[in-house]
């Protein structure tokens, strides 16, 4: 991260010029998913077609959190017309009464391949043409993105998600497993306890704040198991679970 420091003696002056009163252009693809998501500050950031990354070691709580978000009737449940799941069989086997087991079989994929993702893309495009919202959950399939065709198709979905009315949730065990070209695409980060080296890299690549805040935040958030740090990359706002973290400047 480049840190820009103010140099003593340097000043800027703004000269006000005449300017046009431009009309506001409203994008039809920027609709909210459901007004219930605005009840909480954190879920407000999920109330549009975003990309959310969940990072954490095995048994850290990331899969449980995603499951809870989609199971709770006041959160993500009923927000999407279709939910597609890319998840190896063993990854979801540890959850009792897994809500994703109730998905239609043709919306569950046990491997992420170019052909499978292309099939989902076509179905999402058809639904988007009717104004319907979709969601894809990618769980433990990072290795499959080493395939260049699959990675390119994933990026197409990411870049066009607003027009496709698509939200994407991606679960990984480490930040370093995410391809570098994808790391700046995430709208939201849910970070469970990871190594200090990973946190330093996430902070350096994504967060435009002084590195001195990092030890304080890590100590606060990870003092008990299964807690997560939430970051909205557009606004820079951070949360200790559901409670906002305010930095004293």
Regions found by a protein language model. Name each.
Residues 2-9, 40-59, 65, 78, ...:
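P-loop NTPase motor core of the ASCE superfamily
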Residues 31-32, 44, 86, 102-103:
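Intrinsically disordered, low-complexity eukaryotic regions enriched in glycine, serine
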Residues 84, 167-169, 229:
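A structural signal for isolated positions on well-ordered beta-strands in alpha/beta enzyme cores
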Residues 52-73, 88-92, 109-212:
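Conserved P-loop NTPase motor cores
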Residues 83-97:
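Conserved Walker A/P-loop ATP-binding site and its immediately adjacent core
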Residues 1-40:
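N-terminal pre-Walker A segment at the start of P-loop NTPase domains
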Residues 95-112:
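Conserved P-loop NTPase mechanochemical-coupling segment
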């Amino acid at each position: 991260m480049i840190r820009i420091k103010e140099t003593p003696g340097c000043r800027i002056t703004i000269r006000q010029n005449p300017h046009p009163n431009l009309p506001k252009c409203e994008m039809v693809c920027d609709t909210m998913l459901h007004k219930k998501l605005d009840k909480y500050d954190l879920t407000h950031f999920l109330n549009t077609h975003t990309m959310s990354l969940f990072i954490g070691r095995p048994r850290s709580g990331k899969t449980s959190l995603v499951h809870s978000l989609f199971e709770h009737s006041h959160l993500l449940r009923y927000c999407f017309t279709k939910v597609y799941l890319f998840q190896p069989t063993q990854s979801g086997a540890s959850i009792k009464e897994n809500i994703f087991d109730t998905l239609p079989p043709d919306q569950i994929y046990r491997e992420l391949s170019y052909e499978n993702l292309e099939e989902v893309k076509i179905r999402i495009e058809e639904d988007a043409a009717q104004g319907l919202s979709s969601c894809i959950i990618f769980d433990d399939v990072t290795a499959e993105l080493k395939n260049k065709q699959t990675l390119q198709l994933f990026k197409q979905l990411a870049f066009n998600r607003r027009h496709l009315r698509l939200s994407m949730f991606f679960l990984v065990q480490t930040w370093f497993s995410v391809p570098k070209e994808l790391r700046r695409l995430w709208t939201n980060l849910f970070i469970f306890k990871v190594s200090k080296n990973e946190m330093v890299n996430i902070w350096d690549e994504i967060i435009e704040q002084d590195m001195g805040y990092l030890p304080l935040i890590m100590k606060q958030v990870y003092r008990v198991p299964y807690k997560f740090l939430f970051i909205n990359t557009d606004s820079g706002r951070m949360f200790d679970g559901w409670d906002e973290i305010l930095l004293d400047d």
